[in-house]
Amino acid sequence: DSYRSNKKNVLIVEGGPGTGKSVLAINLLVKLTSEEMVSQYITKNSAPRSIYCEKLQGNHKKSYINNLFKGSGCYYESDKNEFDVLIVDEAHRLNEKSGMFKNKGENQTKEIINAAKFSIFFIDENQRVTVSDAGSKEAIRFFAGQLNADVYEMKLDSQFRCNGADGYLSWLDDVLEIKQTANFDGFEFDYDIKVVDDPNVMRDLIEKKNVINN
């Protein structure tokens, strides 16, 4: 409807770790691009964009592929409805302002909604990792209202990691006091919880556990 009518729409897709948010986002980009819609995939973090650009280049020119993947700070000068669809992965990690010194634009969430006829935000508010992470469902709804956009929301529940064990993740949420899930049954085992500052240390710890269990 947004594509045909220019009516601005926003979709919020909420999902926890391993629910397929990034896979769905990339597949949407491929599908929309194949239908000749002007679409881009957005993340704050450059690492996934670099990987996708490398994997998807194929016979396409590098400039063509690079133009499909953008950072979240690219839209503060965009015109209204300049894009058909903007797909935001890890929307919880959006900043408020853009630029190296965080002094450009007004708000990344608002600027993305303004720039697209249809904007899709994949989000998990429990995965914010820095104090500058400002993306939230509340902010998306607020700026969508300012820009007269209709908001739709959906939730991804199926688990594609941990052998599809939704109960295990619910148990983790309860143990880590992320939320009370009342999921106590079936996980009566000893466990260690450690906080490490170096991902290499975490890898080594996991490998040692794998040796014990495998």
Feature-to-residue mapping (PLM):
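Phosphate-binding P-loop
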Residues: S2-V10
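Hydrophobic anchor at the beta1->P-loop junction of P-loop NTPases
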Residues: V13
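Walker A/P-loop NTP-binding motif
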Residues: V23-S34
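Inter-Walker segment of RecA-like/P-loop motor cores
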Residues: V38-L86
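Conserved helicase/translocase motor-coupling segment
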Residues: A25, Y152-G167, E177-N214
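Conserved glycine(s) of the Walker
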Residues: G20
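The conserved Walker
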Residues: P17
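Signature of the SF2 helicase/ATPase Hel1-core->accessory helical subdomain module
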Residues: I87-K155
